[in-house]
Amino acid sequence: MNLNQIHNVYFIGIGGIGMSALARYFKFIGKNVSGYDKTPSILTSELIESGIAIHFEDNIDLIPKDYFVENTLVIITPAVPKSHSEWNYFLEREYHVKKRAEVLGIITKDTFCLAVAGTHGKTTTSSILGHILYESGADVTAFIGGIVENYNSNLIGSGKTVTVVEADEFDRSFLHLYPNIACVTSMDADHLDIYGDDAAIKASFKEFADKVEDKNKLFVINGLPLKGITVGANDDSQFVAHNIRIENGWYIFDVKTPTENIKDLKFGLPGKHNLTNALLALAMARTFGTPTESIAKALASFKGVKRRFSFQIRKPKFVYIDDYAHHPTEINAVHQAVRELYPNEKVLAVFQPHLFSRTKDFANDFAKSLSQFDEILLLDIYPARELPIEGINSGWLLDKVENKNKKLVHKNELIPLLKKSDATVIVTIGAGDIGEMVVNIKKELDEK
């Protein structure tokens, strides 16, 4: 398929974080762009402000008439049900209908692609990498699964020859990509509703890794069962961070690579997982040819990604952090980062589980990760694309949490409880609509 022959791009599910980045991209390169989504959001409002027509009812009559021509590309998200009338209309009339991952595949085939894979850390690592390349003057476009604070966008740059993409393992989407340089951050079990078991996930990551022809351009966290250049901290990795210290809330560290020693790099995101994310981005950028000085400057200026250990309130006696974590390993990483920064403070965690299947598959691990906090408030499960599973609910999960300071709460009870709390650090955690509550939570807690 030749994108140059496409004049119109219509999105079904345009408000998703990945879909909206693609919509911005196609608008930027001069295509006519419009779309449908189920509900209005901050992202859809921003797209409408940029000149993209969006409607919120599954109704063929609301699609602009000039999209009913053969040079229209229709892009769908996996979250859209098969009964969706707009989707079926385009399918039945044999329009070009593609998944988002397939379209990214078409784009990366025609560009130099740097792909970031892994069950955790994709968004932060690809954001750091996109920032490094953009700041160093590369002709790059980075498609990000989150809003990067430096740009207030999920799209970095407008380059035509280099792309940075998140290689998403969900539905084996990353196998559509054509990576020239790639990394794998982690290979923990997830999406068992798709894969069935851990072995199938690992096999899929290996298949992705095999798409990188030159294994000197595949970077893997030390210990993963993949052949590539190893990356780690204080170990025997080929790209290794050492002499790590914290000064005034910043990581300062040295890096030894196969060809050089880099001294006193400065990076502002807390947590050891973020340090290795930065190290992966450094290794990929250095291999791409970015000068060390440019990498160092960009690492120091990187502000982070919204909802990734995002400080909402940072006062001397009270802190509120918001994070997108939705897997036990990610919650552990949030906990580690909080304890590293605030070792003697009382930490309250609010968690909204995401997906019934994920809650069921990892219930014991979720319980262990949540039990580490001083106090836990648990919201109802956010279903996203799923129907309920009998017996799987937040009360069932809470029973497994070994902590006497735990409570099941409804959304309308949350803010009053937080205002009464004596916790000096509050963290909201989850990938569901808890993110839409953050503005109000911040507003109310700012008065504490």
Swiss-Prot record:
EC numbers on record: 6.3.2.8
InterPro entries: Mur-like_cat_sf, Mur_ligase_C, Mur_ligase_C_dom_sf, Mur_ligase_cen, Mur_ligase_N, MurCDEF_pg_biosynth, UDP-N-AcMur_Ala_ligase_MurC
Catalyzed reaction equations: UDP-N-acetyl-alpha-D-muramate + L-alanine + ATP = UDP-N-acetyl-alpha-D-muramoyl-L-alanine + ADP + phosphate + H(+)
Keywords: ATP-binding, Cell cycle, Cell division, Cell shape, Cell wall biogenesis/degradation, Cytoplasm, Ligase, Nucleotide-binding, Peptidoglycan synthesis
Subcellular locations according to the entry: Cytoplasm
Record SUPFAM superfamilies: MurCD N-terminal domain, MurD-like peptide ligases, catalytic domain, MurD-like peptide ligases, peptide-binding domain
GO biological process terms on file: cell division; cell wall organization; peptidoglycan biosynthetic process; regulation of cell shape
Protein role: Cell wall formation.
Protein name: UDP-N-acetylmuramate--L-alanine ligase
